[in-house]
Amino acid sequence: MDDNDDGLMLNFAAPAAGSASVSSKRSKQTAKARFAQKRTAHQLRKQAPKQNRSVAPIESVQGVVTPASARLSPAPASANESPAAKRQRIEATSTSSAALSAPRFDPRSETAKSAPITSRSSQTTSSAASSSRKAIAPVTKLAGSSFASAGASSSASKQTNGGIVSTLFPAHGVLEDSSIALTPFQRKAYHPTNAPSVGSDFASCGLDPLLVYHLASKMNIGSNPTAIQKAALPHLLHPGLDRDILIQAQTGSGKTLTYLLPIVQSLLPLCEESFIDRSVGTLAIVLAPTRELARQIYEVLEKLVSLALSLKEQNQEVEGTVRRTRWLVPGLLSGGSTKNHEKQRLRKGCPILVSTPGRLLDHLQNTSSFDVGKCRWLVLDEADRLLEMGFEEQLTGIVRALDGRRNLACTAARQAMPAYQEGTAPGDADWIPDADVMDTLGMAWWAHARRVVLCSATLDEHVQVLAGKTLVNPKIIRGVKSDAAETSTQVTTDADSTLQKRAVKFAAPAQLAQSFVTTPPKLRLVTLLSLLRSYISRARRQWQHVDHQAGAGRVIVFMSCTDSVDFHYAAFGGARMNASENDASADVQVQDAQLATHVTSELIPDVPIYRLHGSMTQQERISSLKGFSGIRTKHSAERQGFQGSILLCTSVASRGLDLPEVGCVIQLDPPTEGGIEEYLHRVGRTARVGRAGESWLLVLPQELGWVEHVLESHMTIQSSDSASCSCSEIESKKQGSTRKITPASIELVLQQGMGGTMGTLEYQSRATEVQLAFERWVISGERPSLLARKAFLSHVRAYATHSAEEKQYFNVRALHLGHLAKAFALREAPRSLGAKSSAIGASSTPASSHETTNKKRMRIAPDTAESDSSSDSSDDAGSDYESHSNKKGDAFELDKAALAKLTESIVANADGSNRSKKLAREAQKAAAAAGVADDKAKQTDAEARMYAKVRALGKMSKKHGVLGAHAADEFQIA
């Protein structure tokens, strides 16, 4: 794909001022010449005799050691030379002079492994110099190169001030097997499985005409329910069915409206009574695991209760229209807001309340004006996430508090009735049952038991235990779409249905196109940028020529930790293609980016980039979500035309959020918690309610087994004809052409994202220049360098938190830390990063603890004065991407002593004392006493810190003292 076609131009001008730019025609010829010359040089290395490879090197014009083989005459034609190779040899011979004077940096040349040459006046050496690799110095300092390292710490390497500049691509230019690159996978097309049912409408489900009209005219939802709505609404709307409901449906199928519509309709008759207002108290409570999901439900509820209360307001003349009063006011309780303001709203009355568990329990215990004695509805949304985040104790306390308040209110109303006689007890003839108790207004609030609705996309054993504690005689409802648009309600009661539940448990929408890219750790950054550029380009063309809504161009990128989000957010906004390494404005740009709601990138023009993670304030979260969703603000009102945007986030945005028109989800890091369930929740942010979507997963070569043996084996895709299939038929669809996750070629991804002439390696040169732009930004100031180092260390710590079942695929010891550092635009060896990690920890500690931290740093004595440059050159040469970190004495191994001191200071400063260390030792002793330490005696530092942190937070299970940690802030998983 050419740059002129993708609509996203990259400025590949050299940082230093040079001569006039070369014409596009000459650039294309140069790219072809480089491609042909590289292939010819590769054949020369194979055909050259052994004695020719040890020719003494000669000094080149630029002072770079160049082997004599670089000046060899064109190779003679061999006997078995193919026609294609012959054409390449002839073309390379005729254009060798043009190739040698190419102004663009060639990342595959041998001298480029040390430092790239970008000066217009300098000549690039021939790629045939790679035949004498051993004779070349591993790292060469070029004084005249504008890409030379400067301004960074000198402890990383002796050869350059800024570190080691290594190439991204192998010398032969081939990244993967030709079978993957040339045979793209053809995925079978499916009809949407979570789209609204065509053969039914909301009116047939028993919904009030006011709500039917409001959904179609004001909320633009239409009149057709989804499969789960069609299955659940009749049970929730029927006045005689008071059973609790457990709703399970795939993500993006409309579960929020499934429980909000019955709540609003059940309260509409009360609006006909003129003596009832909002002071009646809270009648319905909805619990959500995160602040973002709670606010989203609140916003949907606000739109829902703003419906017209009579048909006359709809310009329809109907006799006998009942007059209703508007007192259904929703309320929101969540962390990050002022409790005094919330108490004022509760004192006035909030009939429908949306809250997070912790804040609701706080008000139940401390707010006396909080009236929940008449509560009729309790909804637990995303129940599996509530349990994973450790809210089980809060949920139990909430249910007990609601039961106690209900009994107190009912007893007080009974005693206030004229027919009440003191001394009576249940069973006596004069005893007034709960169904007959009325308040002073004559309302029988306690005639029906409180209904509990539990919603979840997955039903694991923990959710079933919670359902047993909170639900009474529950009914499990699943919406399954068939050819005839029929829905089925299933209750799991036997072994056969358990198998069916397992098949539906990990179901992805059929219209979601899932792909994965096997990415070497060096190429993670440029591959992410290529995916973003290619999708934005496709969405922009689709918006211009096909559909203005289908190509919205909104992308969500999931990462493993908050430091990684902050680094990529600042790097995309600060990297410039023509910037210098000593740009003094880099620190100011990073500081401005941290304060701004969004940033824009020169690499992805006219597309705002937002971020979202758990360490942001509530106001920053709200601003990011509103900006990404395209809600009209001062900035978005000025934007015209294409409304694409990018959201960089952690797993905090993976559950329940219905962000509008998200067309693509990219997972830079596989989920560290939850496994396949978390993966499905992430990809469920797109392809919602029948819309198309695509998802991309970046995996390292050693992580391919997780895709093949976990995702492919345990995930199903429900097609429109799978409702009538048995479980064995559904499982058999993963074979052959119905593979669920498509392997994609990294070469094609880079080609589409970076552009350039098809059939050449020009995209590799462009990707290298983009990588160098990020590296120049990192070494240009202290703040960018600090962000990159923190992101690298946090990523390694987060990688170590994968569950024991996934350690065979995600083993931190199998990481090539040197190549991984390249993904964070670092030129320093990870050993030196480990030594600098104490400074990172000190920058995040309070001022009162600086002295203690400095004393701890003085005790760290890593051997960082010398670095093994030969090991750097051999391991980081770019010729192979296998992991070498299993070898002892690897130069790219983290300084464990420095990291241990860093983590000790982090844990110690978390609670201001050394209590966490004692708790860590107690946790290890408790685990050893329970028999856990027999098989897992060698716990990682991350696991020990997680035990200590969870102990400090007071979140522990009751199984022999062994702890279960979820979303610990130290590890920045959420």
UniProtKB/Swiss-Prot annotation:
One of its GO terms (cellular component) is nucleus. It comes from the Eukaryota. PROSITE patterns: DEAD_ATP_HELICASE, HELICASE_ATP_BIND_1, HELICASE_CTER, Q_MOTIF. It catalyses: ATP + H2O = ADP + phosphate + H(+). A motif (DEAD box) lies at residues 381-384. SMART domains: DEXDc, DUF4217, HELICc. Residues 1-135, 836-887 are annotated as: Disordered. Disulfide bonds: none annotated. One of its GO terms (biological process) is ribosome biogenesis. It is found in: Nucleus, Nucleolus. GO terms for molecular function: ATP binding; ATP hydrolysis activity; RNA binding; RNA helicase activity. Residues 13-24, 67-85, 92-102, 118-133 have a biased composition (Low complexity). InterPro entries: DEAD/DEAH_box_helicase_dom (IPR011545), Helicase_ATP-bd (IPR014001), Helicase_C-like (IPR001650), P-loop_NTPase (IPR027417), RNA-helicase_DEAD-box_CS (IPR000629), SPB4-like_CTE (IPR025313). Its EC number is 3.6.4.13. ATP binds at A249, Q250, T251, G252, S253, G254, K255, T256. SUPFAM superfamilies: P-loop containing nucleoside triphosphate hydrolases. Residues 531-747 form the Helicase C-terminal domain. Residues 840-851 have a biased composition (Polar residues). Keywords: ATP-binding, Helicase, Hydrolase, Nucleotide-binding, Nucleus, Ribosome biogenesis, RNA-binding, rRNA processing. Residues 25-48 have a biased composition (Basic residues). ATP-binding RNA helicase involved in the biogenesis of 60S ribosomal subunits and is required for the normal formation of 25S and 5.8S rRNAs. The Q motif is unique to and characteristic of the DEAD box family of RNA helicases and controls ATP binding and hydrolysis. Belongs to the DEAD box helicase family. DDX31/DBP7 subfamily. This is ATP-dependent RNA helicase DBP7. It comes from Mycosarcoma maydis (Corn smut fungus). The lineage of its organism: Eukaryota, Fungi, Dikarya, Basidiomycota, Ustilaginomycotina. The gene is DBP7.
